[in-house]
Regions:
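A cross-kingdom marker for long, charged
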Residues: 210, 217-265
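Short coil/linker segments at helix-helix boundaries
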Residues: 2-25, 32-34, 45-104, 110-153, ...
């Protein structure tokens, strides 16, 4: 069932109105102080803003192996990192308190899956702490699998699994071999399938637009501009106030039509 408060917060998030999105999620949390999802979504606002500022969610970043697999060169935003870490800690505290009496509570598991996936992304792409990222990826995989066993229609969980599988699958073979020894596996094609499921499913209640963007960027890496353009068209139409979606759509249009989007009738 849709939650109007959360829907409004996500709308603001995908319109890159980060401060307003944070406040919407914080207000939702104030009305439900025991819910771990509230601070998890505040953390999502912080990380999404950092990604947006650093250009992580662009084709230039995603198509550059040195950047995608090596992380950003600039220093992280100290305030956003502080807010993100605080929201992560609050989420974990509330989720563990819930699971002390309800070990397989789907809401707590969903919050933990989101947090672990976001921590993995933050460690890998922003802080360039790959070993810590691998630890978070293992947590993501564990929590997501438990969650899907309890609530199999929680298709938002496939985004975290898919992004992890895809990025690890893009690593050189020698790095993947080290991760296999550490219990972290990666599979590009499986990752694409998992992200595709989140991008297409009505049951991906909150992260479907983000999954569409990730699918578009992965599709460009896999030389499938038609799939990328389809996702970006839908995003640009649904969120006209987000300049990122329109810019990425303009970049991929000449790849397909052979003409600049500015010259198109």
């Amino acid at each position: 069932m849709s939650d109007p408060g959360l829907d409004a917060g996500f709308r603001l998030l995908y319109e890159v109105k980060f401060e307003q999105a944070r406040e919407a999620f914080a207000q939702w949390q104030r009305e439900r102080p025991a819910e771990p999802l509230g601070p998890a979504l505040e953390a999502a606002s912080d990380l999404f803003e950092e990604f947006y500022r650093k250009g992580v969610l662009t084709s230039e970043f995603f198509l550059d192996d040195n950047r995608l697999l090596g992380g950003i060169k600039d220093k992280p935003d100290a305030e956003l990192e502080r807010q993100f870490a605080s929201a992560v800690q609050r989420t974990q505290k509330l989720a563990r308190a819930r699971m002390a009496t309800q070990p397989k509570d789907p809401d707590a598991l969903f919050a933990l899956t989101l947090i672990a996936g976001m921590q993995a992304d933050d460690f890998f792409l922003i802080q360039r702490r790959q070993l810590d990222s691998m630890h978070s990826l293992r947590e993501t995989d564990r929590d997501a699998r438990i969650l899907l066993g309890v609530a199999p229609d929680t298709d938002d969980a496939y985004l975290a699994l898919g992004v992890a599988n895809y990025i690890i699958g893009c690593l050189p073979a020698y790095k993947r071999a080290v991760l296999w020894v550490g219990g972290v596996h990666g599979d590009k094609m499986l990752g694409m399938q998992q992200v595709s499921r989140a991008a297409a499913s009505e049951n991906a209640r909150y992260l479907r637009p983000f999954a569409r963007l990730m699918l578009a960027l992965a599709a460009l890496r896999e030389k499938n501009p038609d799939l990328a353009r389809l996702q970006l068209q839908e995003l640009a139409t649904e969120f006209p106030e987000n300049p990122l979606f329109a810019k990425e759509l303009a970049k991929v249009t000449p790849v397909i039509t052979g003409v600049s989007s500015h010259d198109a009738p």
